[in-house]
Every structure is written in C-alpha cells, then in structure tokens.
UniProtKB/Swiss-Prot annotation:
This is Ornithine carbamoyltransferase. It comes from Buchnera aphidicola subsp. Acyrthosiphon pisum (strain Tuc7). GO terms for biological process: arginine biosynthetic process via ornithine; arginine catabolic process to ornithine; citrulline biosynthetic process. L-ornithine binds at residues 168, 232, 236-237. It catalyses: carbamoyl phosphate + L-ornithine = L-citrulline + phosphate + H(+). Gene3D superfamilies: Aspartate/ornithine carbamoyltransferase.
Amino acid sequence: MNNLYQRDCLRLLDFTSLELQNIITLAQKLKQYKKNNKEIQLLKKKNIALIFEKESTRTRCSFEVAAFDQGAHVTYLGPGSTHLGTKESIEDTAKILGRLYDGIQYRGHHHSTIEILAKNSKVPVWNGLTEKFHPTQLLADLLTIKEIFPERKFYEIKCAYVGDAHNNMGNSLLEAASLVGLDLRLVAPKECWPEKNIFKFCKEQIKNKKGNIICTENINEGVKNVDFIYTDVWVSMGESQEVWKKRIELLSSYQVNSLMLKITNNPQVKVLHCLPALHDQKTCTVKSILKKYGFKNGMEITDEVFQKNQKIIFEQAENRLHTIKAILVSSLLKTIKF
C-alpha cells in the first residue's frame, strides 16, 4: 500500500523525512525511465485541474508534461478564467472540481486559498506556489543536490541561500532542511530573514537530524566552505516600486558574483537558481529594471556566474518535471507498480 495515496502537498511538512526521501527516490526512477524512453503510463484515465492565478513557465509546463507522460489529461484554468473566490466561493469551486477531477494543482496569491481547496475537494491538492510555500521547487532542488552528491548524506552537504529569505523560498528551504538534515545557512540582512515562528520550529526539528540551520547577515560566515550557493530574484512582478527600491537597497551587497564564490574557499562550489534570473539584458523588461537600479551585470547573480553554472541551473529546472511526476504518481495511485 502506498501511504502517500490521496495525500495533499501543500507544504513539505505535510510529509515525514522518510516520505520526502521516498519521493526523491521515485523521481530518480521516473527520470531514468524517461531518459531511456521507457516511460510507463501509470495515470491513464486520470484527470487533473491546473489552477493558475499567477502566470508560470516552469511550474505549468512541468505539471502538464508530467501528466501527459503518465497518460493523464489536464485542464488549464488560467488567471481570470474561473469564478474562484469572486462569483463563486472557494469552497463551492473545490467541491465541484473534486467531483470532476482526480487532483488539483493551485498556484496563486494566498496560501489560505489552497488550504480551503484541500479541505473541500476530497481529492489530492498540490501547491505550485503560494506566498507562503513553494514545495515543488524544493523537491527539485533536493533531487539536484542528490544527483551531484549521490554518496553523501544530506547532513554532510552545506548550502547557503543568499538573498531574500522572508518569502516562500525561505520557508520551504527551512522545512526541507528540517526534514532531511541539510546544513543550511540563510544569508541575508535581518529584514529579509524568515518569520521567527517557522525558523524556530524548523531549528527545533533539525536537532533530531545531524544538520543545522542558521541565519546570518555576515556573507563571509554564511558562505564559508559551502557546497552550494542558492539564490533567487529579489523582486517580483506586481510588487510596488517602493517595495522594489527598499529590497534592492537592502540586498545590493548580497549579489552572487565571482568574489562571493572565492569567499567560499571551495573551488568546486556549485550555484543553484530557481529561475527566472535577472542575469543579463536580453529582454526589455530586465534591461529596464537593471538600468533603473544601477546594475550593469545582473542583479541577484552576475551573468558570468550564471553562465558558468547554467548546466546545473537548467538541470535543476528540468528536475521540476521529474519530482512533480513523482508527486502525481504517489498521490493518485494506491499501489505503484512498474
């Protein structure tokens, strides 16, 4: 019996440490099947609803391709294409979608919305991103880390997340570290540290593992001897210019660049980025943002560092597909048989 059957994935703490690592192991197996053109369609006749209140590239494509690979059908419900929370309550929408579909993905503005969907739909609900958590991204990150260091335990791996940690990525990184025992350093100004309650909880949980979690403003302390430096964009579309200005001023000295890599004292240090990255000026939008705030060579990461690490970064992005596929298979099948 598959103990993840009919389970939601709203945040990583929905799983135990063993369950999380089993998902990663399943993702490795599914990835190998796809690479060898030996995909086994386990989700035939399954129907999946994809609710996107926010635009998406990697998340939407990963859910759609994962479903198609496994023989499932999807319905894309984009921004403004449903009555969710406007003409119809979230509860009512959840109840009808739960009757029509075998599972629901939600990517939107409020974590409370996905909690209501999960409570009322009676089918598995998966979090493609909310303001609180981004669990499917961290599943891909853990798979990527495991692929690079297959022989190491997670507690033997040091990862510094540099930048804004007061967001869904910071929260999900904390939860991931507390479950697998990663040695995690959140390197940011205090204003960009995670909420105290989730940090305190995850710090307490990791005591049962061999890893560690710290927050520090000190870049030298935070990145010394790490195996990975991880970063994300500092600004999001839809936020006010005032928010952008304040955050960029806070984070300007936390750019991932060649000097920071030298500070690690690890010539083999790897760089992760969950994308999109403001590393070059090849789009009008990014070009105008970088020019406005005085950046000539990328914002949160320089183009030089991005290009040197692009193989890992794009592998990390591809791993969204394989880990999401593992979540779909795990939650929609009573028994997983290959």
